[in-house]
């Protein structure tokens, strides 16, 4: 199978599906890289862990100071490189219809509470979407019945976005 890049639109995903018959895996939840995905060198230069080799230390999620050319601090201790987190949970049905066969949720450097909450949320969304699509079924037989109401907004987030799912906007 192929893991698709996070910045693809739904139309681009459909075009890829039409052009090839391999299983397609799509990121649906997690950090959106501030750099060009797959071409980040910040992690490697700051921590010896390469994001291009699946070991990103996420230095873009840290706080930084913004200093002007005179050396004056303009902004202190802010998340200057952190863009919002990807959340496509409302679009699961569209992704299934577009031919996605597997969903990827980022869990690197996340605590167990975050993982439990987000995975449970997506499990419910996927099950609901599959139930309304005759001919589709789960690829696993296990059941998940959390004793809480999963809600990703209750876990740490820098704000949510569907990124380029509906296409890129000019400007």
Predicted regions and their residues:
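Surface-exposed amphipathic alpha-helical tracts and adjacent flexible/coil segments at the periphery
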Residues: 1-171
